[in-house]
Amino acid sequence: MAACGSTSSSDEQKIKIGIKFDQPGLGFKKSGTYEGFDVDVARYIANQLGYTDAQIEFKEAPSKQREAMLQNGDVDMILASYSITDERKKAVDFAGPYFIAGQDLMVRKDETGINGPEDLNGKRLCSVTGSTSAKVVKEKFAKEVQLMEQPGYAECATALLSGIVDAVTTDDIILAGLAAASRGKLRVIGKPFTQEPYGVGIKKDADSKEFATKINDAIEDMIKSGEWERAIEKNTEGTDYKPDSKYNPPTPNEGE
């Protein structure tokens, strides 16, 4: 990573940012370009740190590889629907949060038997390897749910469309993007049952506190400028999704 404020566009002056490549509306790779709310926030932060868009290098950060990518220095920061948890903070540091999601369920449009997590006993539930979503459902709401893991959310959506599973669980904003991409074949239940603070993952080292403060300042600036709200609206267009106004926009003070 280059010194902040640099304007050179040489290869040495790149900032490497981990995102998801398979989450419509959040982090999505499409014909060599990147789009989604996480991408928009990442670009805003990088610009505030002194990097141009051309100096940003996006790298795929699958859920189960996020901590290792930060620890190994493969990326400078990760914005990949990365919930801040005490367990994760043992391995990495966080800035943010830049968004508070809520865990929800997605079902086929004609599904009538599933209206919340407590209806999942005996049902097949898909989540992504390395995420905490399905464990929450099994431990708190439906002990007899059958869990199925897939490498990505797109695979979970495909399993749902083909009838292999009965529901998909993850954060509401991710599900909203997947439902929009299904063109009406899938729907989100719309009753979030957790709060998931999305953080910017950074390497745990001597400079992480100073880095977190700079990132938090950038997020705060994005919220105040109206860009944050515009990014939400742009990336959930065509769905009924509205972020929970009780928690959003959040106060970014993690890691300071």
For every predicted segment, state its role.
Residues F99-V107, A176, A180-N216, G238-E256:
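Periplasmic-binding protein-like
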Residues S81-K90, V136-E139, D166-Q195:
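A ligand-binding cleft/hinge motif common to bilobed small-molecule-binding domains
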Residues E57-D119:
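Acidic, polar ligand-binding/catalytic clefts
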Residues I56-A68, T112-N115, M148-T158, S162, ...:
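Short helix-initiation/N-cap motifs at beta->coil->alpha
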Residues Q55, S133-L147, V188, I219-E256:
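Ligand-binding clefts/hinges and TM-proximal coupling segments of bilobed small-molecule sensing domains
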Residues M1-A3:
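C-terminal motif of bacterial Sec signal peptides marking the signal peptidase cleavage site
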Residues D40, N47-Q48, E111, S131, ...:
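Extended ligand-binding regions for polar small-molecule ligands
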Residues D11-I78:
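Extracytoplasmic small-molecule ligand-binding "clamshell" domains
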